[in-house]
């Protein structure tokens, strides 16, 4: 019988700035991705890579992301709403309590009403919501939200 090795709850995604779109002295914008789906994290990473210089850190669960917030100090948080253990709304509330004041992009396969309610809640607790999108997110939607 083979033993199953536990999988880490996070992985770091180094980003190489696209020299054609970034000024040479521009520091990469720090982004924290939070989604319990590895495929979605990879898809978001690939899109961000096309948009410019980003220092991306990805987390598969909200509790690990909360621990990473002060260390990574992201400018932008891209967050799923439907996750096990701690959902995106609980995560956003905890992030606000920790003092996170960066921009937020919400992504979810949940219905529009849930995304709209989450957007209003995030704004009510002082977060800057740059967008709320249905999964899978279109690249152009994400580009506009990231650039605002």
Over which residues does each language-model region extend?
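Non-catalytic signal-transmission and effector/linker regions of two-component phosphorelay proteins
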Residues: 1-32, 42-45, 98, 128, ...
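Active-site residues of response regulator receiver
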Residues: 35, 80
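Two-component/phosphorelay signaling modules centered on CheY-like receiver
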Residues: 38-57
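Acidic, metal-coordinating helix/loop segments flanking the phosphotransfer/catalytic sites
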Residues: 58-76
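Acidic catalytic/metal-coordinating carboxylates
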Residues: 60-61, 87-93
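Receiver (REC) domain active-site loop signature in two-component systems and cognate sites
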Residues: 83
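Alpha4 helix (beta4-alpha4-beta5 surface) of REC/receiver domains from two-component response regulators
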Residues: 90-94, 101, 110-132
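A Lys-centered signature of the CheY-like receiver
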Residues: 135
């Amino acid at each position: 019988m083979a033993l199953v090795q536990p999988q880490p709850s996070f992985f770091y995604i180094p980003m190489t700035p696209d020299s054609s779109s970034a000024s040479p002295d521009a520091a990469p914008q720090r982004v924290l991705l939070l989604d319990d789906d590895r495929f979605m994290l990879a898809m978001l990473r690939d899109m961000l890579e096309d948009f410019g210089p980003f220092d991306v850190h990805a987390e598969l669960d909200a509790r690990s992301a909360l621990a990473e917030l002060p260390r990574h100090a992201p400018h932008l948080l891209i967050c799923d709403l439907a996750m096990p253990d701690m959902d995106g709304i609980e995560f956003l509330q905890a992030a606000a309590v920790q003092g996170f004041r960066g921009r937020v992009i919400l992504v979810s396969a949940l219905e529009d009403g849930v995304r709209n309610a989450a957007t209003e809640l995030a704004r009510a607790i002082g977060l800057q919501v740059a967008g709320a999108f249905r999964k899978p997110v279109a690249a152009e939607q994400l580009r506009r939200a990231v650039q605002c």
